Amino acid sequence: MAGTTSHPPNRAAVAFYARAMAFASLRDLVAGGGVAVLTGAGISTGSGIPDYRGPNGSLRRHTPMTYQQFTRDAESRRRYWARSHVGWHHVARARPNPGHRALAELEAAGLLDGVVTQNVDGLHSAAGSQRVIDLHGNLARVRCRSCGVMGTRADLDRRLRAANPGFGLRFAAGPLGAEVNPDGDVTLADREIADFVMVGCPGCEGDLEPDVVFFGATVPPERLASAVTLLSSARALLVLGSSLAVMSGYRFVLRAAELGIPVGIVNQGPTRGDTRAVFTLDAQLSAVLPRLSAELLGAAAR
């Protein structure tokens, strides 16, 4: 009609509508049941453990220990354990956040088949999730590199405190939460750990290693097989809090595509798998997952 003027769309309204539609897609995906979940560091930021590649990710400030460094250099191992000894206390104090608990509720209700996590903090199991595959291991376990005996991190911590009296107290008063990395260590200067003494295996005195997959290492075949089995029997794959930058996680998106399984992604920021997803939602998991659980389980109760 003559005389009418067109107005550009309200960007805030468009963004709100897009988020509402993405959440509706998330709700529909999970409501159908049979969902395998893949989680990354973004699920644990609400518990005070930073991620690697998010807006404030630790990779911007910290280069993680690689498998090659840890295995080839005794001094690198000592440095790792000194930094990890300080960081472990922060990780050990971390508790599941509402996002972890919401996933446990959805699994208990029969909507989720299980969780494959790239995290090493053990928070999914602590929240009550039953079928959890710790793809990259668990910081709460340590292994002897010589005899293969597995031990607990709690026992190692007691032995390290006895061998290094007062060491951890030097850093106890500082703002460690901002400095702890997702792999459980803390960025410390070499001069701060020069006198740190590492202990060996209590059985054979061999070198110890954490039961985690370092950067540059491969996921143990049996663990990978368990994760693939979970995905292969699922109706859908839901990726939560992972940028999918490393192949250990992205491979499951590729596998889902091969199987014709729909993929949904919830993450703060873009991911490597966005173009393969039926929806993406940029959201904080500790907020969106409790809402999802409340809507689905509340609807089931009615």
Regions found by a protein language model. Name each.
Residues 2, 6-302:
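Conserved catalytic core of sirtuin-type NAD+-dependent deacylases
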